[in-house]
Amino acid sequence: MQLNPSEISELLKSRIEGLGASADIRTQGTVVSVTDGITRIHGLSDVMQGEMLEFPNNVFGVALNLERDSVGAVILGDYTGVSEGDQVKTTGRILEVPVGPELKGRVVNTLGVPIDGKGPIDTKETDIIEKVAPGVIARRSVSQPLQTGIKAIDSMVPIGRGQRELIIGDRQTGKTAVAVDTIISQKGKGVTCVYVAIGQKASTINNVVRKLEEHGAMEYTIVVAASASDSAAMQYLAAYAGCTMGEYFRDRGEDALIIYDDLTKQAWAYRQVSLLLRRPPGREAYPGDVFYLHSRLLERAARVNEEYVEKFTNGAVKGKTGSLTALPIIETQAGDVSAFVPTNVISITDGQIFLETDLFNAGVRPAINAGISVSRVGGAAQTKVIKKLSGGIRTDLAQYRELAAFAQFASDLDDATRRQLERGKRVVELLKQPQYQPLQVWELAVTLYTVNNGYLDDVDVAQVLAFEKSLKDQLKAKHAALIQRIEDTKELSKDDEAELAAAIQDFKKHGAF
């Protein structure tokens, strides 16, 4: 066999041209200083804002400050192994976390690494944690209810899917309890929940996870935990990581609920990082962009339209809207809602639920102040039967609060005022609710109907909750079809109303409570 030299050279040329080898060009820099998880790096000329940086021993950081001759970065995780003179490489990637249904039922840290001891999570996709919120055209108005199962909220401060509703109050007023009850209430409703714990004690987070497991809620819940022992950077980024995990479901035409517990501690962590990066402090020593810190996070909670979902899924999901509902929690100091961070978040959200220490200590739990709690968009999403029945309860409460103040000084009251005070006392008593016992729609409808129509006016205040419980037990036993109709149609027809009235009257005559 004779080889032609020209053929050999042509063959070699074609083989060399076919090699698609490209040089992996990555900038390398040197650590100049390390302080409290913040490092300054010299020599990184083409790094991006928010880019992941690779340190020795498989430690990663995020570039936050891009200055003329150095880069300020936060180290994610343990920074004790990073020292002056270490080589740092750029990765060309923005910080991202694993997303997908595989995360349900698991407890992960800010980076999506499991910390519950149940082994690795086999997720198929990752997504960046900092994303632009959906535009105005991509959104749909809030029109579907998100039942919390809490009487005071569902009747007077209704929440819709895609809404941002702030839970605000001092420490130890039951803020987390409201959030956990809301998660438990989503069982069987097709809502994926994400609970983001920021700066909480590890024991507190463990208690929440245990309660969710006890009530079968972990199967549709993802817990993102950045405890008080984690670095400030991990606490500051946890909320964005959790939001990305929730957006995965929203963008695929599903409904998700995210709870940030709490954004006060996230703001503290961001303040700490900013001051260590030597950014100029502003009011209360917060950096100038602390409003943007929360607004860009909470704007990502939205209800998106069918076109957005169809485009995002490349036509795989059609005719479905997706939603991400946010319940941020803010802790106030001595009831001061006019502080910097509370006023910021109040202005960003679509309403707020105020929890008061005085009410909590008086035994009114959940300690919701109905007078100053408001839902700006939830009214349009409220269930028909609840909307019809809840109008009177807010009026009764408002008049009761007003009259109760005068009644302290007035010795003799006319009959109308006395009746109003008695009705108000029963409404306050009826809105009390034990923890971990969220109500279904029919239960709330029956409760509201009973108080609105005066069936409780002659029941002793101390017996109101016992009356309510016994009445529901009797309805379950004798009027299961009525309950099912109210639950299915979310309406109270004239026939159903007549049957309910007869059932309550019968219970008052023969029932034991």
From Swiss-Prot:
Keywords: ATP synthesis, ATP-binding, Cell inner membrane, Cell membrane, CF(1), Hydrogen ion transport, Ion transport, Membrane, Nucleotide-binding, Translocase, Transport. Belongs to the ATPase alpha/beta chains family. Its EC number is 7.1.2.2. It comes from the Bacteria. This is ATP synthase subunit alpha. GO terms for molecular function: ADP binding; ATP binding; proton-transporting ATP synthase activity, rotational mechanism. InterPro entries: ATP_synth_asu-like_sf, ATP_synth_asu_C, ATP_synth_asu_C_sf, ATP_synth_F1_a_nt-bd_dom, ATP_synth_F1_asu, ATPase_a/bsu_AS, ATPase_F1/V1/A1_a/bsu_N, ATPase_F1/V1/A1_a/bsu_N_sf. The keyword RNA-binding does not apply. ATP binds at G169, D170, R171, Q172, T173, G174, K175, T176. It is an enzyme of class 7 (translocase). It catalyses: ATP + H2O + 4 H(+)(in) = ADP + phosphate + 5 H(+)(out). It comes from Bordetella petrii (strain ATCC BAA-461 / DSM 12804 / CCUG 43448). It is a peripheral membrane protein. The record marks S373 as: Required for activity. F-type ATPases have 2 components, CF(1) - the catalytic core - and CF(0) - the membrane proton channel. CF(1) has five subunits: alpha(3), beta(3), gamma(1), delta(1), epsilon(1). CF(0) has three main subunits: a(1), b(2) and c(9-12). The alpha and beta chains form an alternating ring which encloses part of the gamma chain. CF(1) is attached to CF(0) by a central stalk formed by the gamma and epsilon chains, while a peripheral stalk is formed by the delta and b chains. NCBIfam families: atpA, PRK13343.1. One of its GO terms (cellular component) is plasma membrane. It is found in: Cell inner membrane. Pfam families: ATP-synt_ab (PF00006), ATP-synt_ab_C (PF00306), ATP-synt_ab_N (PF02874). Produces ATP from ADP in the presence of a proton gradient across the membrane. The alpha chain is a regulatory subunit.
